[in-house]
């Protein structure tokens, strides 16, 4: 563990600061106050990489990261349960529901945080009032088994999945189980109407409970195709040598913005502020990219196999509409698939 001047120099380098005296003094001041607190509590849905991010921060600052790592739904539920009990136990939070973060901001539950790296984020990737920024973006796509599908048969659009040759050959997930399918179903209903899913239901897709289940079915060859998957799961499988390809369909690619925020009255405010700056750094963005994730920073190259958002046709769902209608939409989807 590095302390004192060595840790400060390493942290300044890790944040990719410009090297100006003012920037260095600001970091030095925050580091000193944060080290007195000694700990930052992070609730994160960044499964698989949170430990690496936390370890890097600890190495560079000497400040311990107390990590709660779980799926987004569990992170949100934990925060809500503690809030209703009048408790603020987390400092920094991260999950994939931008809607909930905006709701908490409107309820004055989030701190407004200055961000040295603000210019490195596109307008849609950062809150104008400093309540959050996008740590990562999740894109949806189609995964396929390269050994089972001939190149000429690989679906290039969402509509291609309706080809009768894919009868009982598609793994799919209900929007009642995850946020990513919500975005995909909303987009495709906007484009094609519910008739799209009535046609898909006739092909008897295998309904699965998670992205991981869908990818594993593709890897094993149980089914050759998985629709509405989170692209990074398929990309990570391909990095490990699995015969998995990813398609970003031509009609549009649903994008989920996954924010980071600091809770109002955080128990370790100085450590929280420093960790928030650290998470926005290019160093962390590049660490995420190596893990198959699309950083919210505009200056970080996307992971291998993942195009930049501007190279796709990104679709951002109406969060207000989803908040009011997601249950009804999921019920309609499930009803169609059960027929």
Give, region by region, the residue ranges found by the protein language model.
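Extracytoplasmic ligand-binding site segments that recognize negatively charged/polar headgroups
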Residues: 43-54, 66-222
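Immediate post-signal peptide segment of exported/extracytoplasmic ligand-binding proteins
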Residues: 23-41, 58-59, 163-168
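Periplasmic-binding protein-like
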Residues: 138, 166-177, 198-201, 207-208, 240-266, 279-302, ...
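A bilobed periplasmic-binding-protein/Venus flytrap-type ligand-binding module shared by bacterial periplasmic
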Residues: 141-148, 185-186, 256-268, 287-288
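A ligand-binding cleft/hinge motif common to bilobed small-molecule-binding domains
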Residues: 98-103, 224-243, 292
């Amino acid at each position: 563990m590095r302390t004192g001047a060595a840790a400060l120099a390493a942290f300044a380098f890790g944040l990719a600061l410009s090297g100006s005296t003012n920037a260095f003094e600001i970091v030095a001041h925050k580091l000193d106050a944060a080290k007195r607190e000694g700990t930052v509590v992070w609730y994160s849905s960044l499964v698989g990489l949170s430990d690496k991010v936390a370890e890097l921060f600890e190495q560079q600052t000497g400040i311990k990261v107390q990590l709660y790592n779980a799926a987004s739904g569990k992170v949100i539920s934990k925060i809500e349960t503690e809030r209703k009990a009048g408790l603020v136990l987390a400092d920094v939070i991260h999950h994939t529901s931008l809607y909930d973060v905006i709701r908490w901001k409107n309820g004055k539950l989030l701190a407004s945080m200055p961000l040295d790296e603000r210019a490195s984020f596109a307008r849609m990737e950062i809150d104008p009032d400093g309540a959050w920024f996008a740590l990562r973006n999740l894109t949806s796509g189609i995964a396929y088994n390269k050994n089972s599908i001939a190149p000429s048969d690989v679906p290039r659009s969402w509509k291609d999945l309706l080809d009768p040759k894919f009868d009982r050959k598609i793994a799919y997930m209900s929007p009642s189980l995850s946020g990513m399918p919500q975005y995909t179903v909303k987009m495709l209903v906007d484009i094609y109407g519910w008739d799209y899913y009535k046609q898909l239901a006739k092909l008897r897709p295998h309904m699965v409970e998670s992205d991981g289940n869908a990818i594993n079915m593709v890897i094993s060859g149980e089914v050759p195709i998985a629709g509405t998957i989170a692209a990074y799961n398929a990309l990570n499988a391909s990095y490990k040598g699995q015969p998995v390809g990813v398609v970003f369909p031509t009609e549009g690619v649903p994008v989920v913005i996954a924010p980071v925020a600091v809770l109002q009255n955080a128990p370790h405010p100085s450590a929280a502020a420093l960790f928030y700056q650290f998470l926005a750094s290019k160093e962390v963005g590049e660490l995420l990219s190596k893990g198959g994730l699309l950083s919210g920073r505009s200056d970080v190259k996307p992971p291998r196999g993942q195009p930049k958002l501007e190279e796709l046709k990104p679709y951002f769902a109406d969060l207000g509409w989803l908040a009011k209608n997601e249950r009804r939409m999921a019920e309609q989807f499930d009803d169609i698939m059960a027929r």
